[in-house]
Amino acid sequence: MASDFYLRYYVGHKGKFGHEFLEFEFRPDGKLRYANNSNYKNDVMIRKEAYVHKSVMEELKRIIDDSEITKEDDALWPPPDRVGRQELEIVIGDEHISFTTSKIGSLIDVNQSKDPEGLRVFYYLVQDLKCLVFSLIGLHFKIKPI
C-alpha cells in the first residue's frame, strides 16, 4: 500500500457519562482502526480493526484531494471547549496537516465562525469520512456503529 498516507480522526468530550469519543485511523498498510466509546446506559467501548483494499485507500486519498483540506488553516476555527473537540490528522505525500477545533453541531456553527469557508471544507470532509468508515465497519462486521 502507499506508505505516504495516514489519516486519523477523533471527536469526543468528557461529560456526565465520562470520556465519550469516536476515533478512527487509516494506516499506510491499509489497516483501519475504529473505536467508539459511549458510557450512556452502561454501553461498552466498541473497537474494530480491519484491513482495506488499496482501492479503498486510493478513494480515501481522492476524497481528501477533492476536498482541498490541505489548503486550509485552523487558526481562526473555534478552539476545543467544554462541548468537545475534534482532531483530524492527515499525511498525504509530503504534506502533514493537523487540525483541532470544537465539536460542530451544524452548519449554523460553521457559518457563525471566523472562517466559515475553511471550516465548511473541514465539516463536509469529516461527514464524508465518517460515512465511509461507518459503511466499511458496518459491512465488514455487520454492526451498527452509532
Swiss-Prot record:
Compartment annotation: Nucleus; Nucleus speckle; Cytoplasm
GO molecular function: RNA binding
InterPro entries hit by this protein: Mago_nashi, Mago_nashi_sf
GO biological process, one term: RNA splicing
Record keywords: Cytoplasm, mRNA processing, mRNA splicing, mRNA transport, Nucleus, RNA-binding, Transport
Pfam families registered for this protein in UniProt: Mago_nashi
Principal location: nucleus
Coiled-coil boundaries: none
Cellular component GO terms held in the UniProt record: catalytic step 2 spliceosome; cytoplasm; exon-exon junction complex; nuclear speck
Highest rank taxon of the organism: Eukaryota
Family, per entry: Belongs to the mago nashi family.
Function: Required for pre-mRNA splicing as component of the spliceosome. Core component of the exon junction complex (EJC) and also involved in the nonsense-mediated decay (NMD) pathway. The EJC is a dynamic structure consisting of core proteins and several peripheral nuclear and cytoplasmic associated factors that join the complex only transiently either during EJC assembly or during subsequent mRNA metabolism.
Subunit details: Core component of the mRNA splicing-dependent exon junction complex (EJC); the core complex contains CASC3, EIF4A3, MAGOH, and RBM8A.
Annotated protein name in UniProt: Protein mago nashi homolog
Organism: Gallus gallus
Gene transcribed to yield this protein: MAGOH
